[in-house]
Amino acid sequence: MSENTFLVEIGTEELPPKALRSLAESFAANVTAELDNAGLAHGKVEWFAAPRRLALKVANLAAAQADREVEKRGPAIAQAFDAEGKPSKAAEGWARGCGITVDQAERLTTDKGEWLLYRAHVKGESTEALLPNMIASSLAKLPIPKLMRWGASDVHFVRPVHTVTLLLGDKVIPATILGIPSDRVIRGHRFMGEPEFTIDHADQYPQILLERGKVIADYEQRKAKIKADAQEAARKIGGQADLSESLLEEVTSLVEWPVVLTAKFEEKFLAVPSEALVYTMKGDQKYFPVYDNAGKLLPNFIFVANIESKDPQQIISGNEKVVRPRLADAEFFFNTDRKKRLEDNLPRLETVLFQQQLGTLRDKTDRIQALAGWIAEQIGADVNHATRAGLLSKCDLMTNMVFEFTDTQGVMGMHYARHDGEAEDVAVALNEQYQPRFAGDALPSNPVACAVAIADKMDTLAGIFGIGQHPKGDKDPFALRRAALGVLRIIVEKNLDLDLQTLTEEAVRLYGEKLTNANVVDDVIDFMLGRFRAWYQDEGYGVDTIQAVLARRPTRPADFDARMKAVSHFRTLEESSALAAANKRVSNILAKSDETLNDIVHASVLKEAAEIKLAGNLVVLRDKLQPYFAAGRYQDALIELAALREPVDEFFENVMVNAEDKDVRINRLTLLSKLRELFLQVADISLLQ
């Protein structure tokens, strides 16, 4: 066995399942950084995580830091001694800091002078001496939002700690971590294997824990086993398990010895919308639903036990008994809610505040209704259906089902609207009004749904900015960043002809006198353009490309996107660098001039061949490109403008812009301003690097 394998395991009470992976990864990253900063050579750092433990295993860890030579330069000789050759206070202070006397110092001579010099051979500290503080420091830096204190001690950690194992090879490293003395004792599964045992060597981990403790400490191995076993269990009943990544991660963090089992529920519950059943199975019980090959929910579910029982049927029956009342509740709520129309919930919206200064949910509903109709008119959607969907948009929030199962908002509105005989695009809009809910989420599928989704988000943006409660730092209680990005994605990806200026003005107008921020329209637009910056950076666009387009402040998102793609393509052209530099030069020249320019370039004042050539090219391109600009064909326009490289280069090589003759000078400045105006029709390419 290798004598330089290092193991640390922190044995705790059950750790927060949703934080387990991040805790383990952060622990590994922190320890790796500590080792690197200390100059300790090491091999692979592996992390392990289970509900009651965090562990790291470091391969090939050096026994000590490498020895090193230390040099510390002192004062120059001229300042180190007085006229009588006695050491100055500066020299004596420096020597004390080095642990020597001045006469023990060496001298360093260079072409710039002579200095006192201290040289020392520093022996590296042993790894054994360094590790305790490294581990303590790494644990203290873990991302723990809320610490616990237990017993009578002042020790704080995410959960109470029971064991600390620190092994370097076969040797226990003496230390007290989180109030617990280090040892070689490890605790196994609560109900299987050995409850407690000793580990002789770091290399035995995690195999010894698997064999004697019945714990799979390897997180990824445990996760892969759950996934494979669940897929196989679903296949056996002719279905496919819904193994969403977030739930799979959570279940992996809840069990030490996963045993996958299959259970069932009564088929009568399938009459309830599947979303409600799935919500309670996944959200409350941490079960995996099962669907047939057509995507229809089956009356089965898969769950993961944390014990290998001699009578698994008893565990299965227990879980079936647990889930049945929840499904029965969903069935009851569904049947009760359908006894009245969705629209009948409108008066109850008056009892729920949207925001104290902005009114109730009924007030918000009225604004969404009006704004959705206005948007529908702009994008060619059915105005009547959009206003109807806007009116019903929040009614399902007052139903029993959504009150009990909050994540079913929207989707239950869709089911109840269908039951009431509403138009299909109205029903779908009630579900899709919240889309996209997160990055990469699906967008609303029809124009009516797009209108309602945009209206809902714009109403929130206008209202919250209108009372001066915009996001600050990482605090965004009204999810305004998500709302803004959602609006932009819908408009761009659905290619809707909407202008943020008029859209925001309409959203603000519907608030009447409630808003107090006089600059609300500009604030909302600036905020949304800022979301564009983050979006396109995530898409891989260069910051300077984004800046070039933002400089024009285009307020039509689809138009903004077209400009981004055009500038990105322009950068691939051979002429782009020269023209970007030329535009920067033109911008600087014009900025330094305070003279009033002409409205047009006067051909009669042009003298040099190069300026005549450039002016001629600009006239031709101006006429040719106007239809391109009007149609948003920015990429084609920039390809045409790339042909200006040669005449622009010739102009700067052969023409003196700041001529002594005022008329000639102003005419040349006007010519350059017309050149810049053409490029600015697309973007400010002078900002390209």
Curated annotation (Swiss-Prot):
Reactions this protein catalyses: tRNA(Gly) + glycine + ATP = glycyl-tRNA(Gly) + AMP + diphosphate
GO biological process, one term: glycyl-tRNA aminoacylation
Statement: the UniProt record of this protein carries the keyword Repressor: no
Record Pfam families: DALR_1, tRNA_synt_2f
Record bears the keyword Ligase: yes
Catalytic EC class: ligase
Primary localization class, coarse: cytoplasm
EC number(s) from the headed UniProt entry: 6.1.1.14
UniProt KW keywords: Aminoacyl-tRNA synthetase, ATP-binding, Cytoplasm, Ligase, Nucleotide-binding, Protein biosynthesis
Subcellular location: Cytoplasm
GO CC annotations on file: cytosol
Subunit structure: Tetramer of two alpha and two beta subunits.
UniProt xrefs under PANTHER family: GLYCINE--TRNA LIGASE, CHLOROPLASTIC_MITOCHONDRIAL 2, GLYCYL-TRNA SYNTHETASE
Family: Belongs to the class-II aminoacyl-tRNA synthetase family.
Record protein name field: Glycine--tRNA ligase beta subunit
UniProt source species: Klebsiella pneumoniae subsp. pneumoniae (strain ATCC 700721 / MGH 78578)
Recorded name of the encoding gene: glyS
